[in-house]
């Protein structure tokens, strides 16, 4: 998996430890991707002394990891149409199995994200603390046990593999949140302002919780 140079005007490196917040460009024929609209809305805000830096990723296999800011924390956002809540991903798996082509026309099937890499990585952000923070902000939220097998999972696994190699700053953490459709894109949906508020709350929780909390958020199947 090849790191990609930042490709938006919001991606100039900032002084001090940053929070890197990424979203995707539109894919699958959609006009907008709410993941990028959320990241763009939070760009420049300060959270507990860390400045949020937004960067847009292309929905393309093998080119979807931005790592230019030496961030203390990286949170990647992606669209999961059909979900009704912000979905904090627990795990990324080492497989690409694309149901549709990416924006470059590639459709890998049963290929590894990282050849020779482990089967999976857990997100290193405090997902339960983030869940509680988002819910307390009044925004629907859940812990998800699968990030799929498309580009979102590819990015989550790739990010965690990069952090595991020790090339990021010591103590750097990362994770992924899937977001629903916007109003007018499909059902179920959430208003953009609610999703922005929820991700803002998730970032605060991630920064302020060096260790996760015990909170029931599992599934039976």
Residue positions per predicted region:
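N-terminal catalytic or cofactor-binding beta/alpha core of small enzyme domains
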Residues: 2-147, 160-165, 171, 189-221
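Short active-site-adjacent structural elements
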Residues: 152, 183-188
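An accessory alpha-helical subdomain
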Residues: 171-184
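Hydrophobic, aromatic-enriched interface-forming segments
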Residues: 153-158
């Amino acid at each position: 998996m090849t790191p990609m140079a930042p490709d938006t005007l919001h991606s100039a490196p900032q002084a001090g430890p940053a929070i890197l917040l990424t979203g995707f460009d539109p894919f699958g024929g959609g006009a907008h991707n709410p993941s990028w609209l959320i990241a763009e809305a939070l760009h420049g805000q300060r959270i507990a002394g860390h400045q949020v830096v937004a960067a847009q990723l292309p929905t393309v296999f093998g080119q979807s990891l931005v790592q230019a800011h030496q961030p203390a924390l990286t949170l990647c956002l992606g669209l999961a149409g059909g979900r009704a809540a912000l979905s904090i991903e627990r795990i990324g798996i080492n497989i690409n199995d694309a149901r549709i082509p990416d924006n470059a026309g590639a459709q890998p099937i049963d290929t590894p994200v990282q050849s020779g890499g482990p089967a999976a990585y857990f997100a290193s952000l405090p997902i339960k603390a983030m869940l509680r923070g988002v819910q307390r902000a009044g925004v629907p939220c859940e812990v998800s046990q699968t990030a799929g097998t498309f580009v979102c999972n590819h990015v989550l696994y790739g990010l965690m593999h990069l952090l595991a190699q020790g090339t990021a700053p010591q103590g750097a953490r990362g994770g992924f949140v899937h977001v629903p459709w916007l109003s007018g894109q499909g059902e179920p949906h959430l208003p953009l302002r609610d999703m922005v508020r929820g991700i803002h709350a998730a970032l605060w929780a991630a920064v302020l919780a060096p260790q996760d909390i015990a909170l029931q958020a599992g599934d039976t199947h």
